[in-house]
């Protein structure tokens, strides 16, 4: 069954262009111009990925991103204006998986969409839990089959990008990882002109969810996980 993409865009020409392009790529595509329309679509059918313009007529797209992430692991790619750098960073902090800027480069966009959907499919195909699939560190358990993180049996919700970054650290414990290397490990961001600040945003988000002293900054070099892993 084709993946279902929802395009949330209030500019008619851009909306029609995206709908036509992704339909030709073989996806099932729904379109709406508002946050209310998105919620209605999600209530009536499964959604795999959302292309979300942050400037909507009825509500702030960044706040909508946070609301979506609180109750769903659906893929979210923000569509922002070229000058909205702060909004892009805030959007990632709110839980978006990725972002693109206008004017849209459709070939780059489809690569980002395909990579994110690939990661979503991997998570859905995860095998049942076994201890051998778990990395343990500082009281945490990162299960690489189920793509879950727990501490003392309590789940900690991670976005796909946060999960991928944490995997990079637990598989290289104590090793200093540069921002460039970490960015290459995030599959949805293997595109030209990557933004290294994406790494800093994800580090801040992980520090908020984990013990803050676990991810250590080595100034001028990168970050490392300050914990034994078994």
Curated annotation (Swiss-Prot):
Phosphorylated and dephosphorylated by TorS. The keyword Cytoplasm applies. One of its GO terms (cellular component) is protein-DNA complex. It is found in: Cytoplasm. Residues 4-117 form the Response regulatory domain. Pfam families: Response_reg, Trans_reg_C. Member of the two-component regulatory system TorS/TorR involved in the anaerobic utilization of trimethylamine-N-oxide (TMAO). Phosphorylated TorR activates the transcription of the torCAD operon by binding to four decameric boxes located in the torCAD promoter. Box1, 2 and 4 contain the DNA sequence 5'-CTGTTCATAT-3' and box3 contains the DNA sequence 5'-CCGTTCATCC-3'. Phosphorylated as well as unphosphorylated TorR negatively regulates its own expression by binding to box1 and 2. The keyword Transcription regulation applies. One of its GO terms (molecular function) is transcription cis-regulatory region binding. Residues 132-227 bind DNA. Gene3D superfamilies: 3.40.50.2300, 6.10.250.690, Winged helix-like DNA-binding domain superfamily/Winged helix DNA-binding domain. It comes from the Bacteria. Its main location: cytoplasm. GO terms for biological process: regulation of DNA-templated transcription. PROSITE patterns: OMPR_PHOB (PS51755), RESPONSE_REGULATORY (PS50110). InterPro entries: CheY-like_superfamily (IPR011006), OmpR/PhoB-type_DNA-bd (IPR001867), Sig_transdc_resp-reg_receiver (IPR001789), WalR-like (IPR039420), WH-like_DNA-bd_sf (IPR036388). This is TorCAD operon transcriptional regulatory protein TorR. SUPFAM superfamilies: CheY-like. It comes from Escherichia coli O157:H7. SMART domains: REC, Trans_reg_C. Keywords: Activator, Cytoplasm, DNA-binding, Phosphoprotein, Transcription, Transcription regulation, Two-component regulatory system. The modification 4-aspartylphosphate is found at residue 53.
């Amino acid at each position: 069954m084709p993946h279902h993409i929802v395009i949330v865009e209030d500019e008619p020409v851009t909306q029609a262009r995206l709908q036509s392009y992704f339909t030709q790529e073989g996806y099932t595509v729904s379109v709406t111009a508002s946050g209310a329309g998105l919620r209605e679509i999600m209530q009536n059918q499964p959604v795999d990925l959302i292309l979300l313009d942050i400037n909507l007529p009825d509500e702030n797209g960044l706040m909508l991103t946070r609301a979506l992430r609180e109750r769903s692991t659906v893929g979210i790619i923000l569509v922002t204006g070229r000058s909205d750098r702060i909004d892009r960073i805030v959007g990632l902090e709110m839980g978006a998986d990725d972002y693109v800027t206008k004017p849209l480069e459709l070939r780059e966009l489809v690569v980002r969409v395909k990579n994110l959907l690939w990661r979503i499919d991997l998570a859905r195909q995860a095998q049942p839990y076994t201890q051998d699939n778990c990395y343990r560190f500082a009281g945490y358990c990162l299960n690489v089959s189920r793509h879950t993180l727990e501490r003392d049996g309590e789940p900690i919700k991670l976005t796909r990008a946060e999960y991928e970054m944490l995997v990079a650290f637990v598989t290289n414990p104590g090793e200093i990882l540069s921002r460039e290397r970490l960015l290459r490990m995030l599959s949805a961001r293997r595109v030209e002109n990557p933004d290294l600040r994406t790494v800093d945003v994800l580090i801040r988000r992980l520090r908020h969810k984990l013990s803050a002293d676990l991810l250590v900054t080595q100034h001028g070099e990168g970050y490392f996980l300050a914990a034994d892993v078994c």
